[in-house]
């Protein structure tokens, strides 16, 4: 298949690498001003969890090809920072590039709002289980064995089976939640609870260090569980039935102290999970989700004292810096 990736970010490039290794053609859609600086190849260091649950370290290269104006693709992957979906669609349309869209995005939007941005484009909402960073032409990333994927009945694409075939060809399984939008909101709420706890002293400039300290501290993880219990109330207030997401929320329903100890053991014994926690260092992207949850909770008049207190210390120390 011919797969396009908007931009050259970590998530899109990680999955592009996996698809290219599976025999598919991959192309990057870049803005005109970035085309000249695009590399011909990227060095890849991957902790690959697709075949080995503990992960397998791999070193390889990824060949970079560029999409041209007017091209048509089997699928186009869009993975952009929160709030930037509209600009992403404008970039694709300005190049007259066509194909069904795979949305690998954090967004706090309602489905109707996203569809207003997309217009008549075919699309499916999904969520990656990968992460990392690109620096000096080297991609250092983690790839799990599955993605979260909207069900065929809710996806707005004409060939859902082709998408499943693409994913299977790259050994990427699919987990299908009740509703992909609500699942993303829950994911953002959980992350907001974790982030607000890790940075509860008010400093968030070094996410890598904060993640390492949090994962090794069962008492801090206990606080995180309590914060998550607050933040998921925001998703419930938006109309989501949390009973439909028992698997996602079960770890936060057991006694917080026990959950904190269990989470510390999980991080210590699972390199895939612990490494992905430390590789995400984009403060603006991290804070986007936190701010969405905070603002929604305030708007709805919810009592979330632990979460609000942590976030307000962070906001104070950010001292008006631009977040998104």
What is the predicted function of each stretch?
Residues 110-189:
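Rossmann-fold dinucleotide-binding core
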Residues 1-55:
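NAD(P)+-binding Rossmann beta1-loop-alpha1 motif at the extreme N-terminus of oxidoreductases
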Residues 3, 25-27, 101, 123, ...:
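Hydrophobic anchor at the start of a short beta-strand
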Residues 181-211, 219-232:
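Active-site-proximal catalytic alpha-helix in oxidoreductases
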Residues 55-139:
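Rossmann-like NAD(P)(H) cofactor-binding subdomain of soluble oxidoreductases
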Residues 225-324:
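NAD(P)-dependent Rossmann-like dehydrogenase/reductase catalytic/cofactor-binding core
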Residues 138-148, 201-213, 269-280:
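Helix-loop-beta segment of a Rossmann-like dinucleotide-binding subdomain
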């Amino acid at each position: 298949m011919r797969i396009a990736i908007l931009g050259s970010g970590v998530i899109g490039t990680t999955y592009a690498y996996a698809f290219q290794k599976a025999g598919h053609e991959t192309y990057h859609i870049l803005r005109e001003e970035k085309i000249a600086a695009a590399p011909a190849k990227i060095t890849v260091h991957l902790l690959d969890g697709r075949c080995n649950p503990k992960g397998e370290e791999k070193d390889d290269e990824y060949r970079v090809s560029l999409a041209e104006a007017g091209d048509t693709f089997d699928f186009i992957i869009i993975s952009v920072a929160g709030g930037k979906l509209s600009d992403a669609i404008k970039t694709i349309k300005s190049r007259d590039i066509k194909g069904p869209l795979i949305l690998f995005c954090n967004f706090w939007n309602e489905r109707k709002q996203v569809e207003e941005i997309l217009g008549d484009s075919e699309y499916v909402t999904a969520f990656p289980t990968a992460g990392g960073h690109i620096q000096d032409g080297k991609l250092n990333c983690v790839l799990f064995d599955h993605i979260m994927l909207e069900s065929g009945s809710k996806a707005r694409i004409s060939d859902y089976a082709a998408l499943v075939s693409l994913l299977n060809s790259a050994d990427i399984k699919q987990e299908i939640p009740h509703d992909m939008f609500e699942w993303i909101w829950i994911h953002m709420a959980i992350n907001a609870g974790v982030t607000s706890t890790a940075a509860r002293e008010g400093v968030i400039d070094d996410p890598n260090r904060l993640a390492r300290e949090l994962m090794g501290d069962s008492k801090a993880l206990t606080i995180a569980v309590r914060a998550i219990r607050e933040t998921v109330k925001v998703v419930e207030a938006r109309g989501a039935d949390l009973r439909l997401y028992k698997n996602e929320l079960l770890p936060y329903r057991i006694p917080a102290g026990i959950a904190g100890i269990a989470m510390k053991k999980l991080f210590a014994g699972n390199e895939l999970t612990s490494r992905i926690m430390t590789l995400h260092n984009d403060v603006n992207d991290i804070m986007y989700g936190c701010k969405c949850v905070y603002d929604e909770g305030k708007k709805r008049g919810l009592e979330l004292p632990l979460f609000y207190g942590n976030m307000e210390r962070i906001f104070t120390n950010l001292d008006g810096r631009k977040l998104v």
